Amino acid sequence: MNLLNGNIKPIYFKYFSAAFGSAMITSVYSLVDMAMVGQYQGPDGTAALAVVAPVWNIIYSLGLLMGIGGSVIFSTVRGQETQKSRNENEYFTVAVIGSVILAFVSWAAIIFFDKPILLFFGADSSLLSLAESYLTPVKAVIPLFLFNQMLAAFLRNDNHPELATASVLAGGLFNVVGDYIFVF
């Protein structure tokens, strides 16, 4: 990939289509979540899921924080031909360590402070138990979801945006099938 002398259009569309595809897949499986829960639990289920959504979004954002931040520095160092003294893999390692720390802190916060967090995000006495039941599986996959976001960013910046999109697609399919199995 030669960004200085090559044709930028195919490179741009390769990355654009992968990013757009990932965003669309994420949007679709979020809608499927809401639709299935709404069909099974009704308005209270949808409201409880809306209370849990900010927790999920924060974990997603922490994964993006480590992934995008680390992968941009990784790519910058990789692209600098004059500065080979720093190994770009060090930045990947730092992102992994940072993700482990953030996953552990997030996991501990949600395990020990789940009720106050849900109340902060709008749960009331009628929604709290339902929101807690939706949050239970989230507790189990916090590290996986955070690492998925972090690794997808590194894959994109390591010239493999199609692998990042494939991982998002696999997660989306698992989510839709899991919704059907676990909700109904």
Where is each model-derived feature located?
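Interfacial/gating helices of multi-pass transporter permease domains
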Residues: 37-57, 126-130
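Residue-level signal for short hydrophobic patches within transmembrane helices
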Residues: 9-28, 55-62, 140, 166
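Transmembrane alpha-helix boundary and packing residues in multipass membrane permease domains
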Residues: 19, 23, 35, 72, ...
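Small-residue-rich hydrophobic transmembrane alpha-helices
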Residues: 46-108, 145-164
